[in-house]
């Protein structure tokens, strides 16, 4: 942090209180923000970490209508769940409040009124979709229809979730109201707009000239918006849920959620510090950092700064370290499709393993490009890195100390050249980790911390103190002293990343606290200092545990496919005479068995009313042979025989229907008929 700043205000994007938090939110915003804040606190710097729930906006009203409850019921439920999940996961907010609070309503209204009185808004009349049955204007998300790009049904008025294209309500083909299902009409409505074009000049200089250090994805997106030319943006909308526009003639209108939500950072600070909140938002010696996902870049880098500048008394953000998106098993995370790993469910399924997820999400952090989370990678990083590297080194160092020195830190004797080389390797770790954290490279910083554990593992493997114990206990003492100093350094280096493990390790080391300035020192544990009992820092995660999570996702995928199933188009019309050429008959299955060395095939002996025939069918993955014996099936009797590589000849084709998920269902009859009966 630059010397000109005395304190840092850190904000993290306010999650919508219309559903739980998932790993995409964590990887994109909350884990990196928490790492950074914990790092600053360890350095004894003055920092404030502000969070809260975004409780206004259309997604909340849509869920409320769907569930037949009020929007307040929705936000009360999810605010509590989100807040408790964050707390259990170790996201260390100084305050986690909400935008339905009295403080927020007052401050957001006051903010709008200040800009209104200063003439910072323009009034515009526009045409907007209106639901005549529900008697209300329709927000973007209240309009659905066919996407003009990929032609998927159910695209929203602001975006198609199938192809990801941003849309306007008027882009949709055959639009309909999500409230009544009726076709909406266009009606005139008046709103207030923030003229971003008026702010384009100073925004261009402030971002493109003064903040070239911002991440390329952030800088690039801002440049793209500025190069296209900024347009006025509505700050109000026709809705009955939100903060009422505080001026005359604004009945039935509320503050647009993008205007309302970022003010929540300020109101939450005011709620926490009613007497000193302005120091954290208006003092030029305060540094403001926004942690967000890439879908919020324009709001935090262009729109919110324009709001703050227009108000006139607030500082502007110094950095906006936005991440890209995290995908799940190769597919985009989607709340509506339930394609996510939900934080509250993870905490239930993996009790005491908060740090494993924190570690994996940081190791796979989408800092400059979209990245992917897979359960197999989660397991591998836990077992091969946390357990086999970090945990293994800590355990060996402590267990050997208890075995040979009754758990007391042994005396460090004369150092060998190898000892000195090892100590030199981790002497610079503080500077390396600091350099990376200061520029928000959390993935590389965590990797640097793990390298410290690798150094320790290699040191013990090379020096083999368990072998020297028979001949040279002085040498063993020196080796274990060095190993323990490395362990203590790991407790500090990993504190911002893995706070639960660092706390557990400090207890094992019998140390209440460490400070960041101590990182890299080789005398953190005094000779003779008594250690506590050694415990495993991490546990191996077994295959069946991971398979249970994979199966849960597969079940979700099948449910989504079933819900979105659309039959294939009908094939070209054929003449009746063409159909008559097919001889479709009923046969009774006399025998059925799997074809040896061809596990997908079943061999049937079919009674067709004239003789018995052999038919081979590729349905072995869908039926057990015994399930089909005695059943009647439909088959094409006049299909040319087909010979397989093993010499087997199939004399027909059994008819099956293919379900949406690829499973096959053999066609059958409602009542039994004579074998050989024709299908007409």
Curated annotation (Swiss-Prot):
Cofactor: how bound: Binds 1 zinc ion per subunit.
**Per its UniProt entry, which superkingdom is the organism in?**
Bacteria
In the Enzyme Commission scheme, what number(s) does this protein have? 6.1.1.10
Question: What do the Gene Ontology cellular component annotations say?
Answer: cytosol
List positions binding ATP: 335
Which cofactor does this sequence's record say it needs?
A: Zn(2+)
Where does the motif 'HIGH' region lie? Answer: 15-25
Enzyme class label: ligase
Q: Where in the cell is it found?
A: Cytoplasm
Which Pfam families does this UniProt record tie to the protein?
Answer: Anticodon_3, tRNA-synt_1g, tRNA_bind
So which residues are the signal peptide here? none
| BP-aspect Gene Ontology terms | methionyl-tRNA aminoacylation
Q: List the disulfide bonds.
A: none
Which SUPFAM superfamilies does the annotation name? Answer: Anticodon-binding domain of a subclass of class I aminoacyl-tRNA synthetases, Methionyl-tRNA synthetase (MetRS), Zn-domain, Nucleic acid-binding proteins, Nucleotidylyl transferase
The entry lists its GO molecular-function terms as: ATP binding; metal ion binding; methionine-tRNA ligase activity; tRNA binding
* Ranges for domain tRNA-binding: 578-680
Question: According to the UniProt entry, where does the motif 'KMSKS' region sit in this chain?
Answer: 332-336
Which reaction is the catalytic activity of this chain?
tRNA(Met) + L-methionine + ATP = L-methionyl-tRNA(Met) + AMP + diphosphate
Q: Which UniProt keywords apply?
A: Aminoacyl-tRNA synthetase, ATP-binding, Cytoplasm, Ligase, Metal-binding, Nucleotide-binding, Protein biosynthesis, RNA-binding, tRNA-binding, Zinc
Residues that bind Zn(2+) = 147, 150, 160, 163
Which family is this sequence assigned to?
A: Belongs to the class-I aminoacyl-tRNA synthetase family. MetG type 1 subfamily.
Q: Which PANTHER family match?
A: METHIONINE--TRNA LIGASE, METHIONINE--TRNA LIGASE, CYTOPLASMIC
How is the subunit organization of this protein annotated in UniProt?
A: Homodimer.
> What is the role of this chain?
Is required not only for elongation of protein synthesis but also for the initiation of all mRNA translation through initiator tRNA(fMet) aminoacylation.
- Name of protein: Methionine--tRNA ligase
Organism encoding this protein: Phocaeicola vulgatus (strain ATCC 8482 / DSM 1447 / JCM 5826 / CCUG 4940 / NBRC 14291 / NCTC 11154) (Bacteroides vulgatus)
């Amino acid at each position: 942090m630059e010397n000109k700043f005395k304190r840092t205000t850190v904000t993290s994007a306010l999650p919508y209180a219309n559903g739980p938090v998932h790993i995409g939110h964590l990887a994109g915003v909350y884990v990196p923000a928490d790492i950074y804040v914990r790092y600053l606190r360890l350095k004894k710097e003055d920092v404030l970490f502000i969070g809260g729930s975004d409780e206004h906006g259309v997604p909340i009203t849509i869920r409320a209508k769907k569930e037949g409850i009020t929007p307040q019921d929705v936000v009360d439920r999810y605010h509590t769940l989100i807040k408790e999940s964050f707390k259990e996961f170790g996201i260390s907010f100084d305050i986690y409040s909400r935008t339905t609070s009295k403080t927020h309503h007052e401050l957001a209204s006051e903010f709008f009124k200040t800009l209104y009185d200063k003439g910072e808004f323009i009034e515009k009349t526009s045409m907007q979709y209106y639901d005549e049955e529900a008697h209300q204007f329709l927000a973007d998300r209240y309009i659905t229809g066919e996407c003009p790009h990929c032609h998927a049904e159910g695209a929203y008025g602001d975006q198609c979730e199938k192809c990801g294209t941003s849309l306007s309500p008027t882009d949709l083909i055959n639009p309909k109201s999500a409230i009544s299902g009726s076709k909406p009409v266009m009606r005139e409505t008046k709103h207030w707009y923030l003229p971003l074009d008026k702010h384009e000049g100073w925004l261009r200089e402030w971002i493109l000239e003064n903040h070239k250090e911002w991440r390329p994805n952030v800088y690039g997106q801002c440049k793209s918006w500025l190069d296209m030319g900024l347009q006025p943006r509505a700050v109000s909308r026709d809705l009955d849920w939100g903060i009422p526009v505080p001026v005359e003639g604004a009945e039935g209108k509320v503050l647009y959620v993008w205007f309302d939500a970022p003010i929540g950072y300020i109101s939450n600070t005011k709620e926490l510090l009613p007497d000193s909140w302005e120091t954290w938002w208006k003092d030029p010696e305060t540094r403001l950092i926004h942690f967000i996902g890439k879908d919020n870049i324009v709001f935090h880098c262009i729109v919110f700064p324009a709001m703050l500048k227009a108000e006139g008394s607030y500082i502007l953000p110094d950095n906006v370290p936005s991440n890209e998106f995290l995908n799940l098993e190769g597919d985009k995370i989607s709340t509506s499709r339930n394609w996510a790993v939900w934080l509250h469910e993870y905490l239930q399924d993996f009790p005491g393993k908060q740090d494993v997820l924190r570690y994996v999400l940081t190791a796979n952090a989408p800092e400059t490009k979209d990245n992917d989370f897979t359960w197999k990678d989660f397991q591998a990083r836990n077992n091969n890195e946390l357990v086999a590297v970090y945990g293994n080194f800590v355990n060996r160092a402590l267990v050997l100390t208890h075995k040979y020195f009754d758990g007391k830190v042994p005396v460090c004797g004369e150092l060998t050249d190898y000892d000195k080389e090892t100590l030199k390797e981790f002497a610079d770790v503080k500077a390396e980790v600091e350099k990376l954290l200061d520029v928000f490279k959390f993935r590389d910083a965590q990797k640097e911390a793990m390298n410290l554990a690798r150094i320790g593992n290699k040191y013990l493997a090379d020096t083999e103190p368990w072998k020297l114990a028979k001949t040279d206990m002085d040498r063993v003492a020196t080796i274990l002293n060095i190993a323990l100093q490395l362990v203590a350094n790991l407790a500090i280096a990993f504190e911002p990343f893995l706070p639960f493990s660092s706390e557990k390790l400090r207890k094992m080391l019998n140390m209440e606290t460490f400070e960041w300035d101590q990182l890299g020192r080789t005398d953190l544990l005094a000779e003779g200092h008594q250690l506590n009992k050694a415990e495993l820092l991490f546990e191996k995660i077994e295959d069946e545990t991971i398979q249970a999570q994979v199966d849960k996702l597969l079940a979700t995928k099948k449910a989504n496919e079933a819900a979105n199933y659309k039959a294939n188009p009908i094939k070209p019309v054929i003449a009746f005479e063409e159909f008559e050429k097919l001889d479709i008959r009923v046969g009774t299955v006399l025998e059925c068995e799997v074809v040896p060395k061809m596990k997908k095939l079943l061999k049937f002996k079919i009674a067709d009313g004239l003789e018995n025939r052999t038919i081979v069918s590729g349905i072995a993955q869908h039926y057990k042979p015994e399930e089909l014996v005695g059943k009647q099936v439909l088959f094409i009797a006049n299909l040319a025989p087909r010979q397989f590589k093993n010499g087997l000849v199939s004399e027909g084709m059994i008819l099956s229907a293919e379900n949406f998920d690829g499973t096959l269902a053999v066609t059958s009859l409602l009542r039994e008929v004579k074998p050989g009966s024709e299908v007409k």
